[in-house]
């Protein structure tokens, strides 16, 4: 059975074809024996639209399809009381073979939003097919978005492909974070970098307006990890580290220099952490990367960068970190 293609700036269907023509997944096109790919409960979809209303922003529209869901927006950020904070939840508790997931997040003009996850995302062991995820973010004029999920943990023999597109107005700001773990390294000797494929693509375009095609391409970053074909422990890749953090900050050029001045390169092999920031093409923003021996160290580095970005762009800082995070 053929699968419909993803088209346009948002994903509103229940199925997508991401991964079918990906060379890195060519040998993983077989149908799962347990439940067919993109079946009931395996085609998750989540749409979140945030809008400005008087003194604060609100979650104005929400659409969900299992296993993806959210609950109501909360306002727990005391430094930004106008900021709606939404937690994405999976009713399945993990990502399984044959899963096809998609997310649309829209921040309308002048609105703000913070989106996170309830916990780390696990990509379970697979014996057929793969899992895929499409993410689309649109941030309109003067909008502000923070997308700060917890780490993703690929289990042994798993295959996962993700494609992220950010459409952003030149006056808007978006901070997009992702943290990838080496696997469940304390669970089994073969779990550390035991996954088959992890493929990630992130691209950004200028937002031209609603119902308009995507504007100028600002940058594209893609990497494909196949640790069973090529070791990730090499110098210049992961070396001895087990956690990788990647943060994309898209914001007007006027903020870049001040942020970079406060984010020096950091390399401490004994302390198990390395991080640094640089500019993205087309003066569209900055990219910050961190390596660590565990998720805690990488998350701390990301939080510090996030804090600096907020202070320089909005003039407000982060609230105290929750004890359970």
From Swiss-Prot:
Q: Which domain of life is it from?
A: Bacteria
A single GO molecular function term of this UniProt record: nickel cation binding
Q: Any idea what this protein is called?
A: Urease accessory protein UreD
Q: Where in the cell is it found?
A: Cytoplasm
Key words, A-Z: Chaperone, Cytoplasm, Nickel insertion
Q: Which Pfam families match?
A: UreD
- In which broad location class does this protein mainly occur, judging by the first location in its UniProt entry? cytoplasm
Q: Would the keyword Cytoplasm be found if you checked this record's keyword annotation?
A: yes
- State the similarity comment: Belongs to the UreD family.
């Amino acid at each position: 059975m053929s699968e419909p293609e993803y088209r346009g700036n948002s994903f509103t269907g229940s199925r997508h074809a991401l991964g079918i023509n990906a060379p890195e997944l060519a040998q993983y096109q077989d149908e799962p024996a347990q439940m067919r790919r993109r079946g009931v409960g395996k085609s998750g979809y989540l749409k979140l639209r945030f809008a400005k209303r008087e003194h604060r922003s609100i979650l104005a529209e929400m659409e969900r399809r299992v296993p993806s869901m959210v609950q109501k927006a909360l306002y727990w950020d005391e430094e930004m009381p106008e900021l709606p904070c939404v937690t994405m939840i999976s009713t399945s508790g993990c990502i399984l073979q044959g899963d096809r997931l998609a997310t649309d997040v829209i921040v309308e003009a002048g609105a703000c939003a913070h989106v996170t996850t309830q916990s780390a995302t696990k990509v379970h062991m697979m014996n057929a097919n793969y899992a895929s995820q499409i993410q689309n973010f649109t941030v309109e004029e003067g909008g502000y978005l923070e997308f700060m999920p917890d780490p993703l943990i690929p289990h042994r023999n798993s295959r996962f492909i993700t494609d992220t597109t950010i459409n952003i107005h030149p006056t808007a700001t978006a901070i997009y974070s992702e943290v990838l773990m080496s696997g469940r390294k304390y669970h089994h000797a073969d779990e550390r970098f035991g996954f088959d494929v992890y493929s990630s693509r992130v691209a950004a375009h200028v937002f031209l307006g609603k119902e308009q095609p995507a504007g100028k391409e600002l940058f594209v970053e893609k990497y494909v990890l196949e640790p069973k074909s090529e070791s990730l422990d090499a110098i210049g890749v992961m070396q001895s580290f087990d956690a990788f953090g990647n943060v994309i900050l898209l914001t007007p050029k006027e903020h870049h220099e001040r942020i970079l001045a406060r984010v020096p390169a950091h390399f401490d092999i004994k302390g198990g952490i390395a991080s640094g920031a640089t500019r993205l093409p087309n003066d569209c923003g900055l990219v910050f990367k961190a390596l660590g021996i565990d998720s805690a160290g990488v998350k701390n580095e990301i939080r510090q960068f996030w804090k600096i970005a907020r202070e320089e762009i909005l003039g407000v800082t982060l609230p105290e970190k929750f004890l359970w995070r």
